[in-house]
């Protein structure tokens, strides 16, 4: 057998070639798992004294989507627990909780979530599983209705103690990108809320299953959607809870693993059959793809021949500081809860936008100009609107709801709390 077809570590038969090196199955599994172990190096079995094992001092919460990447992270963390139990007579350095946000009401899966979780429980006996419906974000929440104008101004047209629903929320969102953006905001909210709940009994770290390619996709999609200020919070690791916007440690154990390597790992570990896709598939027509789908397609097409691109994007993102670190008087965005300076987003948007058209040169342009002027006059904010509360929105959320005339969103607060957050 030639050197070119043998594993670089043990000279066994090559199962995969990646990063300009050959690996057999066992060596590749070890290679990938070592990256996860390094990120979770604090999850070791602790001893009070020789022979006296302490209970787990940390809880690892893994958000799962039933996709390949989060499934791989779950398998790696579970394998670490199995090794600890075998080595230290059933001792464990951490507890493992997998949390799934059920978005099937908005985007159905090929299998029922309960059926999938039942299969995962059989495969990963040392992990606990929690399924949270997306609708929980609306439970016990007031609903705020925003009137949104084409000049990007928004006003609170109604506040109700009655909660809205997933379908009501999504029905007023016109574009696929905006729908995915709002759903991701709700998913993250529910995951962090569950992590904070578990943190009350045991210090909890959120271990996201994003691989390097997915983090690169997330970096660019956040930038395109006007959420560049979220890159520091969602792409970077925050092992110190003081550095995290959620107040909890957040890590990315797979941030040095490429997405095309994940299916090989799952196949070698015999867990590929546990991955489940959504019923809806991405369109074959580029213009019908959402921003997230476009970014995914872009990196999937280039990473095999240019694997360094994704890691370069992630390393560049890691150099970004928190844009709000030195700012005072920030309040949370009504929709995504990002810290934002009241009215700054709209002011910045107005300043960078060309608000007046060029002078018409032909009769046709003159007619179109008059028509546009009439439409703009009809859409101008009336005196009644000017007396309505102004919601505190970040630039990204203003862009997300720009094509929506009326938007109803859940708000976990009383009417007075909501009014106190608005500028009158």
From Swiss-Prot:
Compartments it resides in: Cytoplasm
UniProt GO molecular function: nucleotidyltransferase activity; sulfurtransferase activity; tRNA binding
Stretch list, region Disordered: 357-385
Keyword tags: Cytoplasm, tRNA processing
GO cellular component: cytosol
Pathway membership: tRNA modification; 5-methoxycarbonylmethyl-2-thiouridine-tRNA biosynthesis
Recorded superkingdom: Eukaryota
Extent of Basic and acidic residues compositional bias: 368-385
Listed GO biological process terms: protein urmylation; tRNA thio-modification; tRNA wobble position uridine thiolation; tRNA wobble uridine modification
Disulfide topology: none
Role this protein plays: Plays a central role in 2-thiolation of mcm(5)S(2)U at tRNA wobble positions of tRNA(Lys), tRNA(Glu) and tRNA(Gln). May act by forming a heterodimer with NCS6 that ligates sulfur from thiocarboxylated URM1 onto the uridine of tRNAs at wobble position. Prior mcm(5) tRNA modification by the elongator complex is required for 2-thiolation. May also be involved in protein urmylation.
Similarity-based family: Belongs to the CTU2/NCS2 family.
Protein name: Cytoplasmic tRNA 2-thiolation protein 2
Lineage: Eukaryota, Fungi, Dikarya, Ascomycota, Saccharomycotina
